[in-house]
Swiss-Prot record:
Gene name, Swiss-Prot/TrEMBL: APOC3
Matching InterPro entries: Apo-CIII, Apo_CIII_sf
The name this protein goes by in its record: Apolipoprotein C-III
Principal localisation: secreted
Signal in keyword set: yes
GO cellular component: chylomicron; intermediate-density lipoprotein particle; spherical high-density lipoprotein particle; very-low-density lipoprotein particle
Organism, scientific name: Canis lupus familiaris
Chain positions found as Methionine sulfoxide: M63
Gene Ontology MF annotations: high-density lipoprotein particle receptor binding; lipase inhibitor activity; phospholipid binding
Glycosylation sites noted in the Swiss-Prot or TrEMBL record: T94
UniProt PTM comment: The most abundant glycoforms are characterized by an O-linked disaccharide galactose linked to N-acetylgalactosamine (Gal-GalNAc), further modified with up to 3 sialic acid residues. Less abundant glycoforms are characterized by more complex and fucosylated glycan moieties. O-glycosylated on Thr-94 with a core 1 or possibly core 8 glycan.
GO biological process, one term: negative regulation of triglyceride catabolic process
Function comment: Component of triglyceride-rich very low density lipoproteins (VLDL) and high density lipoproteins (HDL) in plasma. Plays a multifaceted role in triglyceride homeostasis. Intracellularly, promotes hepatic very low density lipoprotein 1 (VLDL1) assembly and secretion; extracellularly, attenuates hydrolysis and clearance of triglyceride-rich lipoproteins (TRLs). Impairs the lipolysis of TRLs by inhibiting lipoprotein lipase and the hepatic uptake of TRLs by remnant receptors.
Subcellular localization(s) per the UniProt record: Secreted
Signal peptide extent: 1-20
Amino acid sequence: MQPRVLLVAALLALLASARALEEEDPSLLGLMQGYMQHATKTAQDTLTSVQESQVAQRARGWMTDSFSSLKDYCSTFKGKFTGFWDSASEAKPTPASDAF
């Protein structure tokens, strides 16, 4: 839903109110006002749910990107230290080779 829908609904409500006053039929005026209130509430609820959905999608995207970056950082960090530990264990003589 777009804000234009709310504007159209408000204009229709004003038009319906003006026409109902011309007709001098209070039941028609009440019926139209009730209908327009219901239509306005439905439009507002739909707009709110769309906005909440967009916010939820952005939050999920942000969390996914953050966890992906953290995972990449941990993999890089682990890779650097794994290479360090492997080279350190190869350079260090074992106690069995000192005995010979």
